[in-house]
Amino acid sequence: MNSPKASVLIPVYNGERHLPECLDSVLAQDFRDLEILLSDDGSTDGSAKIIENYAARNSHLRWWRNPKNLGLTANTNVCIRAAQGEYLKFVHQDDLLLSASAISKLAAELDRNPGVSLAACRQHLTGTGSRPLVFCDRTGIYDGRRMIVASLERNTNLIGQPTLTLFRRRQAQRGFDERFTGFMDFEMWCHLLEQGDFAYLTEELASWRVHGDQQTARHAASRETDMEHLRFMEIYYAKPWLRAAATDRMLFAQIYYLGKKHGREARGLTDLMRSHLKCGRFVWQWLKHKAGRPWGKLGRKLAGR
């Protein structure tokens, strides 16, 4: 039996509320050469029954239940290890694909551009008080390592959530780093972008649902995510290429954030980064930061965000 072109991967844990809408959006895709894999991480709600019903009607949908709860990152890696497709498409249980051609359009970018290691579409958010992050207004191919630096300059994950992305299985076989939970997505994007370029589509092909009960929201609000940021920077700033590529803006953003959040805990790292940013340049970046804050708030207010 030939392997499918793409694997749709859905890690599940107590997702009964939004799971049917998620699965319906995946089954509506016009990209047919795919498998759909769901890994239930010991749900205590009706998720398993929902999956069972869908699997009975769709032969290309396969699922299993982990013998014990593994946690978000480890369950995500179970999906990767089970996948057979050339391309991997995560769709989280709360999310949905907005367009029937979502997978087709992202896959076309990887087909056309062998040097691209990660493709993503524009972010669409569902949820009260949501504010979408717009990377840029132009579809195109962007240097992978430059995308990492740009994200660190803005202290933001410019790629977005897994539901927005598509990537090659061979470049992701390491899996998500299980030292991270709140930072797991961005760390994986960096792992992929060290291997190739980034393809960006301005179309809103998928939607990320924001609500307080989701696992990622709980982790993002925790002290642990701040600690993961520090851990990530300790790992990545040890890479010679990042030290060489670091801009003044990136260094200032990380020194400022880590110092504010961690103080003495981050002193060794922030002192090292400060040694690569001469005093006058640090002061200049600080003045730009202070001067730009009111204008940034005004711009977001005028844009309705």
Give the label of every model feature segment.
Residues 1, 153-155, 187, 194, ...:
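C-terminal subregions of glycosyltransferases and related glycan-biosynthesis enzymes
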Residues 3-6, 27-38, 46, 59-62:
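Short loop->beta transition adjacent to catalytic acidic/histidine clusters or analogous donor-positioning motifs
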Residues 8, 121-123, 127, 133-135, ...:
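Conserved nucleotide-sugar donor-binding catalytic segment
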Residues 14-28, 99:
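Short, well-formed alpha-helical segments that are part of the catalytic scaffolds
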Residues 40-49, 68:
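A conserved acidic beta->alpha catalytic loop
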Residues 66-83, 96:
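Glycine-rich, basic loop-to-helix element that forms the pyrophosphate-binding segment
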Residues 88:
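Short aromatic/hydrophobic "clamp" motif used to bind/position activated sugar donors
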Residues 100-134:
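Conserved donor NDP-sugar-binding/catalytic core segment of glycosyltransferases
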